[in-house]
């Protein structure tokens, strides 16, 4: 039974067959967006995002889609860009409020829970619409690294590896091959670049760039962009893999 076209997709209420179409449309916005991945390794977390360069007038590596929420927390979003910017701002407000009230950094699980609750509220009222973004939360604290993904309906889960966007299926297949328990941050940077190059659609002939951040032992627990030198090395590695030069790489190593 289909309820599309009968008005049930015009607001936030359930159709007779139990579907919430506005929430499903929010997922569609994410599915058609840039590929974003998160990798939780032994000593930290990597966030990586493919950004299509829509104009040659744009300054390279300036229009960031990954932001710091607190010193130890980073958030990457993919989907409807303004919604993602709002989610990052909301997360920063939550982190600031926690510090003001408790005098300590907000735990990763708390920020994920609060974002999930906030996003879920936008699926409950007819005067608003769901957020068309998937949010990746990367944190590092005394208990180690943590990676969460908050979905458009407010559900959030903890992950070792997560992917969303156009190339999500290819990315997930590649992530499943990784040994997260022994993977180091610098190696994870290379793997993240390789996976994003594997998901890139060459047919659209559009330039793209990779935005990547990390938090963990290598950064003394502070969320920062991956250094340019390391990112360029990782992208060169990914290009060689994409060009089918695996044997040459193995010989060099």
Swiss-Prot record:
GO terms for cellular component: cytosol; nucleus; proteasome core complex, alpha-subunit complex. The keyword Cytoplasm applies. Its main location: cytoplasm. The keyword Phosphoprotein applies. One of its GO terms (biological process) is proteasome-mediated ubiquitin-dependent protein catabolic process. It is found in: Cytoplasm; Nucleus. Keywords: Cytoplasm, Nucleus, Phosphoprotein, Proteasome. InterPro entries: Ntn_hydrolases_N, Proteasome_alpha, Proteasome_alpha-type, Proteasome_asu_N, Proteasome_sua/b. The modification Phosphoserine is found at residue 104. It comes from the Eukaryota. SUPFAM superfamilies: N-terminal nucleophile aminohydrolases (Ntn hydrolases). It holds the Pfam family Proteasome. The 26S proteasome consists of a 20S proteasome core and two 19S regulatory subunits. The 20S proteasome core is composed of 28 subunits that are arranged in four stacked rings, resulting in a barrel-shaped structure. The two end rings are each formed by seven alpha subunits, and the two central rings are each formed by seven beta subunits. The catalytic chamber with the active sites is on the inside of the barrel. Belongs to the peptidase T1A family. The proteasome is a multicatalytic proteinase complex which is characterized by its ability to cleave peptides with Arg, Phe, Tyr, Leu, and Glu adjacent to the leaving group at neutral or slightly basic pH. The proteasome has an ATP-dependent proteolytic activity. This is Probable proteasome subunit alpha type-7. It comes from Schizosaccharomyces pombe (strain 972 / ATCC 24843). The lineage of its organism: Eukaryota, Fungi, Dikarya, Ascomycota, Taphrinomycotina. The gene is pre10.
């Amino acid at each position: 039974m289909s309820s599309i076209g009968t008005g049930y997709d015009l607001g936030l209420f359930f159709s007779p067959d139990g579907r919430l179409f506005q929430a499903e449309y929010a997922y569609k916005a994410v599915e058609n967006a840039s590929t974003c991945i998160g990798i939780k390794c032994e000593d930290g977390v990597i966030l990586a995002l493919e950004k299509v360069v829509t104009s040659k007038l744009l300054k390279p590596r300036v229009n960031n889609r990954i932001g710091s929420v607190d010193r130890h927390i980073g958030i990457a979003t993919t989907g409807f860009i303004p919604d993602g910017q709002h989610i990052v701002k909301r997360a920063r407000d939550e982190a600031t409020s926690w510090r003001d009230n408790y005098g300590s950094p907000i735990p990763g699980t708390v920020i994920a829970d609060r974002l999930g609750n906030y996003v879920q509220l936008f699926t409950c009222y007819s005067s608003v619409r769901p957020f068309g973004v998937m949010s990746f939360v990367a944190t590092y604290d005394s208990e180690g690294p943590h990676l969460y993904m908050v979905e458009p309906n407010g559900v959030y889960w903890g992950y070792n590896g997560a992917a969303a966007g156009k190339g999500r299926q290819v990315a997930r297949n590649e992530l499943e091959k990784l040994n997260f328990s022994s993977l180091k941050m610098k190696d994870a940077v290379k793997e993240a670049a390789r996976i994003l190059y594997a998901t890139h659609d060459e047919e659209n002939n559009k330039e793209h760039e990779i935005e990547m951040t990390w938090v963990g032992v290598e950064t003394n627990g502070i969320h920062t962009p991956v250094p340019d030198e390391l990112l360029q090395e990782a992208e060169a590695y990914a290009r060689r893999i994409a060009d089918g030069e695996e044997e040459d790489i193995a010989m060099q190593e």
